[in-house]
Amino acid sequence: MRYVIAVKSPIYGKQGAFLAYQFAESLIKKEHEISQIFFFQDGVSNGNALVYPANDEVNLQKHWQMFSITYNVPLHLCVAASQRRGVVDNLTTPTTAHYNLAEGFTIAGLGEFIAASLNADRVITL
């Protein structure tokens, strides 16, 4: 089956983002396909390069990055939610010298999410 995973939970402080990561790992192990992971609302904090976990905490951002590289799954952040929460890339910031989008993440519009959702068998939101 083909899945799209939508993550609305912040990177830390709640369990939703970590559960989404665990679910994505399980899907791949069961040989399902994930066409994209879309972060929206507070979930865009998963793509903020300025988030530094404590040494004894899981580095969830690093896990997402490795997941994306290993399984070729794009990590998309909602452009509107990102801008409202101060997560910008070199194209969406007014000053191109300052951006904080983490490596491996892409800022995208709802159109990309909807297109992927239309081609998916399941859309899961966490």
Swiss-Prot record:
Subcellular location(s) per record: Cytoplasm
The question of whether Cytoplasm is a record keyword is answered with: yes
Q: What is its main location?
A: cytoplasm
**Could you tell me the keywords of this UniProt record?**
Cytoplasm, Transferase
The molecular function terms of the Gene Ontology recorded here are: sulfur carrier activity; sulfurtransferase activity
List the InterPro entries: DsrEFH-like, Sulphur_relay_DsrE/F-like, Sulphur_relay_TusD/DsrE
- This entry's Enzyme Commission designation comes to 2.8.1.-
The GO biological-process annotations, alphabetized, read as:
tRNA wobble position uridine thiolation
Cross-referenced Gene3D superfamilies: DsrEFH-like
Superkingdom classification of source: Bacteria
Entry's Gene Ontology cellular component terms: cytosol; sulfurtransferase complex
The catalytic site is made up of C78
Q: Decide whether keyword rRNA-binding is in the record.
A: no
**What's its job?**
Could be part of a sulfur-relay system.
**Similarity comment:** Belongs to the DsrE/TusD family.
Q: What is this protein called?
A: Sulfurtransferase TusD homolog
What gene, per UniProt, encodes this protein?
A: tusD
